Curated annotation (Swiss-Prot):
Cofactor requirements of the protein: a divalent metal cation
UniProt keywords, alphabetically: Carbohydrate metabolism, Cytoplasm, Galactose metabolism, Glycosyltransferase, Manganese, Metal-binding, Transferase
Purpose of the protein: Major galactinol synthase mainly involved in the biosynthesis of storage raffinose family oligosaccharides (RFOs) that function as osmoprotectants. May promote plant stress tolerance.
Protein name: Galactinol synthase 1
Family membership noted in the UniProt record: Belongs to the glycosyltransferase 8 family. Galactosyltransferase subfamily.
Protein species of origin: Ajuga reptans (Bugle)
Tissue specificity as recorded in UniProt: Expressed in source leaves, specifically in the mesophyll.
Gene: GOLS1
Catalytic activity: myo-inositol + UDP-alpha-D-galactose = alpha-D-galactosyl-(1->3)-1D-myo-inositol + UDP + H(+)
Signals that turn on the gene: By cold. Follows a circadian rhythm; accumulates mostly at midday during the light phase.
An MF annotation (GO) of this entry: metal ion binding
Transcription among keywords: no
Amino acid sequence: MGPVVPVEAFRSAGKISALGAKKGYVTFLAGNGDYVKGVVGLAKGLRKVKSAYPLVVAILPDVPEEHRELLRSQGCIVKEIEPIYPPANQIQFAMAYYVINYSKLRIWNFEEYSKMVYLDADIQVYENIDHLLDTPDGYFYAVMDCFCEKTWSHSRQFSIGYCQQCPNKVTWPAQMGSPPPLYFNAGMFVFEPSKTTYQTLLHTLRITPPTPFAEQDFLNMFFEPIYKPIPLVYNLVLAMLWRHPENVELEKVQVVHYCAAGSKPWRYTGQEANMDREDIKMLVKKWWDVYNDESLDFKAEDSIAGEETFSMPSFIASLPEPAVSYIPAPSAA
């Protein structure tokens, strides 16, 4: 169990942000590798769905200047951040590169924005999701993860075949105590930048032993008191297609997370497990169709204008009371 997070770290719940507040999307980029293609694809995807908000790219100092210029040429707001490292520990992360992901915590310091949607660089947006920026304040919104892949082999959930995506299939054994709290995938989430939250995150990190899923485990621990699940249409982790197909209506999915081994479109060969599936091939092609569409390249006239004039969808008017644990998705139609 992690440290107790003081309630002062969170804003008061239950209010709606002012319509004129500055909002945006944010992603994270490190190094000189090919993930920059993912960010370019994401920028073009947000333009394709006519998002009213900018894409901020939080970059580490090791991102080369040519990649920064490429991102600016695609209309991105590039903000350099300093890396954050967890306390020294002998833990083996599920993936070695996860250690650098703690640097994502810097985005809570982007106080010029009242609310943001974080998206990993291997995500693509296929429907307009701007309405997520009008959800009630005081909560952390994200999609529940799946525990069925081998990267979870270290966990109690995996050891007994339990997954929160189908909690009645294998029930949590009484002898193991209470079931674990709901756990989200940190590739996409809705959050509120705040100096107080930012400082508390950094302080809590210094006294929290690292765990295999790095910043994702940490964020789950930290935001457990205010976490609200949202439908998987906002972050389709590809393993859901073969682990829980009964939970997926692919035609309604609005955000696809290309996080399965071999699924990054810019590296795709179809050789890895499950990558020869027709639905995977279709989703990879769908990403490339956006990436290669020159009409989606940034033009000066595309500059984000007048966020104050963005109209709130009727979706917000029908939101349940903030005390509920689930925010429904609007139709993808």
